[in-house]
Amino acid sequence: MNDHTSPTSSSSKTDNAQQPTKSVKSQLYQALDDVPIADVRRFRRRLKNANSADALAAIGADVEAARSGVAKRDAHIPAIEYPEHLPVSARRQDIMDLVRDHQVVVIAGETGSGKTTQIPKMLLDMGRGRRGLIGHTQPRRLAARTVAERIADELGQEIGESVGYAIRFDDRVSDTTAVKLMTDGILLAEMQRDRFLNAYDTIIIDEAHERSLNIDFLLGYLKRLLPKRPDLKVIVTSATIDPDAFARHFADAEGNPAPVIEVSGRTYPVEIRYRPLVEPVEMKDGSVKEIDTDMIDGVVDACKELMREGDGDILCFFSSERDIRDCMEAIEKQHWRGVEVVPLFGRLSNAEQHRVFAPHSGRRIVLSTNIAETSLTVPGIHYVVDTGLARISRYSTRTKVQRLPIEEISQASANQRSGRSGRTADGVAIRLYSEENFSARPEFTDPEILRTNLASVVLQMISLRLGDISEFPFIQPPDRKAVRDGLMLLHELGAITDKERGGAPVLTAVGRDIARIPVDPKMARMLVEANRLGVLDDVTVIVASMTIQDVRERPLEYQAQADQAHARFKDATSDFLSSLKLWDYIGDSRDELS
């Protein structure tokens, strides 16, 4: 009798032992269709190297936990209803069909059509937002928070349940969140650690017509990413300002542009009245000379004229917070009965910002920056007063300084503003400039990429290893001199070397640190150096103060008192040290109160 087992018999036993393992592995691979997209690659890598029953059991437990997270998110999504009065609701099925059949869809509609609040709900209805988030970008923090609150309210939930938001210094996203509102800057920062955007199954780029630097970079990045993420859907929403440009940008390999769907619905006629800020004055010699009049007086006179037209709220556009405060004071001096004056700009507190959306009696006059032009829909507006001005960021290649001058807006922006009065009924818009002046204005506002310093976007591109900058698919390529200026600044900051790799410079260790900090490269360089010198806490306060508007209030009627109150924080040698004194005072006061 032979005690030795034959090789054939041994091999057969090994194969039999491996059969259950192969079966379990196959089942686990199939189960990956139900786990978050961001986890799939990690699970595949673990499964590839797992050969024992114990290893597969551990992976199986983790896969089941991941599937439970997806199921939890799905179970939390309520039944979805759509306001039938919104134009976008009438095109619901058309939009859902296009999203199902195409990787990119462009949706064009005027402010108030409902596209910003209803499209995320349609995507939830389609089953998206389960294995990955529906990322929804906004150009402004106020809009991101307000839109998230509105969608959550329509779903009957609190913020942070199925709908959350992430803006600088405030993150309200939980493990049940399916729709994530955020500024486009937040999404750009996330690319540093999630280059394939695996946290998302859908990206909505809202207000794309604004053509900010971040939006243009995101559109180029997504064009490169889509072939590598065939499961990712991209929705580009825009006002009816050249939506075909976005469709052409996302043309497929055969050159077919992405589909465009119009959802503006009905708009009402708007009567445009021109009231230039000049007053004819008869001179001693009998001639008539036009004298410039005060803008605030012009706004007050326009409001008086519109109040004689009938009921309805008035929306007035200004270029700055200071002008808004001055106008509030001027209107309050009129002592109009039953008139509420409400400001609207980005630096207001949450409670003050919500006032503009709260129900009210009587007439309301809303004094706003251009945030109400497209980002937010102010309800009840029948009349508009347009000063024709806005702060527009511009970079001087000669002085190497980024400025924020007050300029005349474009024809497209003026039409956007006047259109706010024709959403629910016939409207009237008063422009505080002449028709000749309007006709002489540029048709569109220059995209930000043509009027800003490009150091930050160039740094992002180098960090993400996107190759030759001149080959990047920008919707509109930047000026070569602006790119050179950006590279020169990064070189001066010590962020890049003289060497090149793949047609692009190479980051230094300092450059890699700067790229991870979501502020202007010059300020990020300050933080890196402060950390090296051991003064990071103080310099962080100074940098933070440089990235926002002055926190000190100087109301027109209390300027002397304000200056007296602020005097204790003044440092004769440096405004930066004044900011630090103010911060220390706030910290000490908080400690005392607590």
Where are these regions (language model features)?
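C-terminal helicase lobe and adjacent C-terminal extensions/tails of nucleic-acid helicase motors
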Residues: K304, E329, S456, H491-T497, ...
